[in-house]
Amino acid sequence: MTNIRKTHPLAKIINNSFIDLPTPSNISAWWNFGSLLGICLILQILTGLFLAMHYTSDTTTAFSSVTHICRDVNYGWIIRYMHANGASMFFICLYMHVGRGLYYGSYTFTETWNIGIILLFTVMATAFMGYVLPWGQMSFWGATVITNLLSAIPYIGTDLVQWIWGGFSVDKATLTRFFAFHFILPFVVSALAAVHLLFLHETGSNNPSGIPSNSDKIPFHPYYTIKDILGALFLILTLMLLVLFSPDLLGDPDNYIPANPLSTPPHIKPEWYFLFAYAILRSIPNKLGGVLALVLSILILAIIPLLHTSKQRGMMFRPISQCLFWLLVADLLTLTWIGGQPVEHPYITIGQLASILYFTILLVLMPITSIIENNILKW
């Protein structure tokens, strides 16, 4: 008699995705981030659900309802901080996952890669709207500044911004719709993640060497299930250390001041995980140019497969490309730092140089380096 997991319609899908899935035998810990992102998503949906039970999306009571969750709801404080810091862990895993894809040439699976980019945009939109909900000073002014960027779109910009706001400024209508979208989008992310996996399982996983691994595959369970559990333990340990010892480390103190349209905070900035894009936005004096650069800073990932000029897939055996990759990482860390600094000398210049370097590495230096490395191989 055949095992039920191989015959039952539902169990068969799970079996082919997580149990009997043929997996390359040499994938490293960098391949753990996919499962960690799944855990982050589940954690965010669960903590978010419990927060939504006590939260009110009205400008007069939103801030108080968050305070009520932290003070009066049983274990409300831990749920709130797990949700806030869970978002930070989510983005750490996301950026590691994308970085892994860039380093090892996983972007050659174009369908999987493109769905991944859509996922990244959706998660960023979800996180942005979530940051508005506590209705603190940074929530209000962050929402005002970022939504206002759409007014740079020629002809329809102003009307579009007012349509999104539901009025002439960020107000009650904006908060209510942001809460509705923030609630529904994680489920859209879940569906997209399923499609992401579907496309991945059409081709099978990449591996560190970049060489086809059809001749050397092992079952996902128990080898990689146990490895994923270890990764999950590290993730939960890091998250709980953040939540229990320094829950406000990554947040902004201004968000503990209730939103006040009459008082602008000295430095308006988004959460740390958007600072690199915010720095690129601020580097360009022109409003429309800044918005385009902001969108392109993420959308540039979509043309990476077209710029792949190397004869090898990953960077494992390409030392010059490796140096460029880590220069890109250092550049992104510099941009993140600049995004959190006030707009004054020398930060403006550093930000502009880092922004130029970011696009230059991806669009010019990496393709040229790959061609040079191809020629070195001939010697």
Curated annotation (Swiss-Prot):
GO terms of biological process kind: mitochondrial electron transport, ubiquinol to cytochrome c
Pfam families found in the cross-reference section: Cytochrom_B_C, Cytochrome_B
Binding site for heme b b566: 97, 196
Main location, first listed in the record: mitochondrion
Keyword annotations: Electron transport, Heme, Iron, Membrane, Metal-binding, Mitochondrion, Mitochondrion inner membrane, Respiratory chain, Transmembrane, Transmembrane helix, Transport, Ubiquinone
Miscellaneous section: Heme 1 (or BL or b562) is low-potential and absorbs at about 562 nm, and heme 2 (or BH or b566) is high-potential and absorbs at about 566 nm.
Protein name: Cytochrome b
Source species taxonomy: Eukaryota, Metazoa, Chordata, Craniata, Vertebrata
